């Protein structure tokens, strides 16, 4: 069965893993998923990730992060979906929780957080919001 929204699947695996208090979760690998995980790691929402071989396919093992027993990610949501894409210019990028969270944006310069995109003055597709 084909997956219609691989990024939505990744975010759901992270959300479910943290709700179940898992140390790590597995996800199929792709370049977009790895770039999104790079942003989450840079911003301190996950401890890290590594590529693994999963029965002949490459996968990603995502090390989840907790702070005083609570998940580092309180909320994660997909913004731009396969049926409705959402684009934003650098000056119009949404702020999550008044700047306490991040928006993940796919730009011509790669997948960036909203702060990085504003700093580089680039807009793009708003992929997800995290806090």
Swiss-Prot record:
Transmembrane segments: none annotated. Gene3D superfamilies: 3.30.1370.30, 3.30.1490.10. Keywords: Ribonucleoprotein, Ribosomal protein, RNA-binding, rRNA-binding. The keyword rRNA-binding applies. GO terms for cellular component: ribonucleoprotein complex; ribosome. Belongs to the universal ribosomal protein uS8 family. HAMAP family: Ribosomal_uS8_B. One of the primary rRNA binding proteins, it binds directly to 16S rRNA central domain where it helps coordinate assembly of the platform of the 30S subunit. PANTHER family: 40S RIBOSOMAL PROTEIN S15A. This is Small ribosomal subunit protein uS8. It comes from Rhizorhabdus wittichii (strain DSM 6014 / CCUG 31198 / JCM 15750 / NBRC 105917 / EY 4224 / RW1) (Sphingomonas wittichii).
């Amino acid at each position: 069965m084909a997956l219609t929204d691989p990024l939505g699947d990744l975010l759901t695996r992270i959300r479910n893993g943290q709700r179940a208090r898992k140390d790590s979760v597995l996800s199929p690998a792709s370049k977009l998923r790895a770039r999104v995980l790079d942003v989450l790691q840079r911003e301190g929402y996950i401890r890290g990730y590594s590529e693994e071989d999963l029965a002949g396919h490459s996968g990603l093992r995502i090390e989840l992060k907790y702070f005083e027993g609570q998940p580092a990610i309180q909320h994660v949501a997909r913004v731009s979906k396969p049926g409705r894409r959402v684009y934003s210019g650098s000056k119009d990028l949404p702020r999550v929780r008044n700047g306490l969270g991040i928006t993940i944006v796919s730009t011509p310069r790669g997948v960036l957080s909203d702060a990085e995109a504003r700093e580089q003055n680039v807009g793009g597709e708003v992929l997800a919001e995290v806090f």
